[in-house]
């Protein structure tokens, strides 16, 4: 087929299909994987929105394009996308590229099935069951339930819904009008999905009682006890506490044993949002950070974050063995969940979720785990802690780096103090001027494509950087580069 000809439908032409896919895979390997993970290449190729629209030629037209043009489209998509597998990408709680997980993602997309019944996803139903069993065992449960969800936010929302249903099962049929005012409790450092979940589930954000956190970002159990008493005095019914293991900004781990004691005294559902910190359970050295997690009723854990399983890979784990997920979320659609099937219908998982179609998220994690084993994944976690500590110690040797606090996880939070502000901490406008530094440096690094680091204000603190040390390909040289690059970018400030 000539390059100038429009690409016809490939249906029924296996030779053409193979040729196209081999060509596309070649582009992916060259551009997204080899270049996208090389320190000799940029993390991103920044373009302003209008320029990017022109470069991509986004308009969808009546006529198709040639195979040559399609391959150029693929190259352009990769070229102008952020390379999250790059060793200099420190911007989010996910980074890196695991080849076995990527292989699992490719297979998943190729098979294009929905994980709601055993009859159309037999391999993945059994695989998901085994992966969830393994995750529960790491939490400390010998039995239980669980499901893969489309992100940690949904896992957290499911936990709230399950806790409400367990206490008031009539609400599934009769709705909110049957409920008294409810109260749930979480730290001010919690993920924003708790507030969004309360709104989405009809509880309202006023039902979320915000518990104090200490100077390190950990929930204060004494204030939790106080907030529960206040809610009851106001006529609300407490039903859930959401603790956090690995907060988004500071990387704090709530004191789960003390929080579990409070929940036990008051008969409250304990949910642990371990979306970020759950993978620490794989480390014998560091799993003490989650001591008490086995006392939770539910746990959210995102292996797509620290384990780099690839977006998305988010598990909700339950200690419950009463089929609570299906009772709460099920609707028994007769065209999917026939009860007279030729196999054990308990294998059909679709009624555990509020979705109908559900993508397969277990294969990438299973394949990576098969390749790495517990020991390989543990080394990955431990190395992240080692490199985070290396970065902190190197910062202390240099002028111009001020830690927000000593990290206990792999979130390293700090200010870069440029030359013009050094020694001027007592100036009345010092903090205001310091807060303006991170946005300027972020713009410079992104537009050069040298690296990406996130920043944010936090409480009374002005903007500071948060480096996430999670990519298993990182070395001490990458940590040194980060510090050197900040010094270079900020030398004139």
UniProtKB/Swiss-Prot annotation:
Broad EC category: lyase
Expression by tissue: Expressed in liver and brain. Also expressed in both astrocytes and neurons, but lower levels are expressed in astrocytes.
GO annotation terms (biological process): L-cysteine catabolic process to hypotaurine; L-cysteine catabolic process to taurine; taurine biosynthetic process
Catalyses which reaction(s): L-aspartate + H(+) = beta-alanine + CO2; 3-sulfino-L-alanine + H(+) = hypotaurine + CO2; L-cysteate + H(+) = taurine + CO2
Cofactor(s) required, per the database record: pyridoxal 5'-phosphate
GO MF: aspartate 1-decarboxylase activity; pyridoxal phosphate binding; sulfinoalanine decarboxylase activity
UniProt xrefs under InterPro entries: PyrdxlP-dep_de-COase, PyrdxlP-dep_Trfase, PyrdxlP-dep_Trfase_major
Pathway field: Organosulfur biosynthesis; taurine biosynthesis; hypotaurine from L-cysteine: step 2/2
Superkingdom of origin organism: Eukaryota
EC numbers on record: 4.1.1.29, 4.1.1.11
Location of N6-(pyridoxal phosphate)lysine modifications: 305
Entry keyword set: Decarboxylase, Lyase, Pyridoxal phosphate
GO-annotated cellular components: cytoplasm
Gene3D superfamilies: 3.90.1150.170, Type I PLP-dependent aspartate aminotransferase-like (Major domain)
PANTHER family in the record: CYSTEINE SULFINIC ACID DECARBOXYLASE (PTHR45677:SF8), GLUTAMATE DECARBOXYLASE-RELATED (PTHR45677)
Sequence similarity: Belongs to the group II decarboxylase family.
UniProt subunit comment: Homodimer.
Function: Catalyzes the decarboxylation of L-aspartate, 3-sulfino-L-alanine (cysteine sulfinic acid), and L-cysteate to beta-alanine, hypotaurine and taurine, respectively. The preferred substrate is 3-sulfino-L-alanine. Does not exhibit any decarboxylation activity toward glutamate.
Protein name: Cysteine sulfinic acid decarboxylase
Organism listed in the record: Homo sapiens (Human)
Lineage of producing organism: Eukaryota, Metazoa, Chordata, Craniata, Vertebrata
Gene name in the database record: CSAD
